[in-house]
Every structure is written in C-alpha cells, then in structure tokens.
C-alpha cells in the first residue's frame, strides 16, 4: 500500500499591521490648533509650549503657529511658536 507522509507545518507567515507612527509635521512648518505633530509609543518627544500630550502619547498643537523642535537636558521638546 503506497502511503504519503503529511507535510510539516510552518511556524512562520504572520505579520502585524503597521501603526503609522512618527513625525507628521516638520520643524518650521505651520500648524493649526488640534493638528497632530508626532505619533509615538512613550515619550520619545515631550510636549513644550502650546503643545499637548494625548493619552497614547500623541503630541498635538494647542494653538496655530510654527513647529519648533528643541533639545534640553537630553530630552526632545516640541514647541509651537
């Protein structure tokens, strides 16, 4: 009786969907109040003047203005000036 062994199962073949994180507005760019500047996991960037921090660590503009990235004592801050 001719038999055929069953094929082995693969442990690969999965991937998660991308989360679209990162900087959405560059330094020197004009933004309106409420616009998202950075989407991040944790505080890679910290909120500065006229910027807010969402519960998922998203940084957004509180007022209309120009985006400014500043480093102070090893931390990156985002200001709207």
UniProtKB/Swiss-Prot annotation:
Q: Which GO terms describe its cellular component?
A: cytosolic large ribosomal subunit
InterPro entries found in the cross-reference section: Ribosomal_bL27, Ribosomal_bL27_CS
This protein's UniProt keywords:
Ribonucleoprotein, Ribosomal protein
User: What Gene Ontology terms for biological process does this UniProt record contain?
Assistant: translation
Identify the stretch(es) annotated as Disordered.
Answer: 1-21
Q: Which domain of life is it from?
A: Bacteria
Task: Please name the GO terms that the record assigns under molecular function.
Answer: structural constituent of ribosome
Keyword check for Ribonucleoprotein, yes or no.
yes
Q: Which SUPFAM superfamilies match?
A: Ribosomal L27 protein-like
From start to end residue, where is composition biased (Polar residues)? 1-11
**According to its UniProt record, which protein family does this protein belong to?**
Belongs to the bacterial ribosomal protein bL27 family.
Protein name as catalogued? Large ribosomal subunit protein bL27
Source species of the chain: Borrelia hermsii (strain HS1 / DAH)
């Amino acid at each position: 009786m001719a038999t055929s062994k069953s094929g082995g199962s693969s442990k690969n073949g999965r991937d998660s969907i991308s989360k679209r994180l990162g900087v959405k507005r560059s330094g020197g760019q004009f933004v309106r109040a409420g616009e998202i500047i950075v989407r991040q996991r944790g505080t890679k960037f910290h909120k500065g003047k006229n910027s807010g921090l969402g519960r998922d660590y998203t940084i957004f503009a509180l007022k209309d203005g120009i985006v400014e990235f500043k480093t102070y004592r090893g931390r990156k801050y985002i200001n709207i000036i």
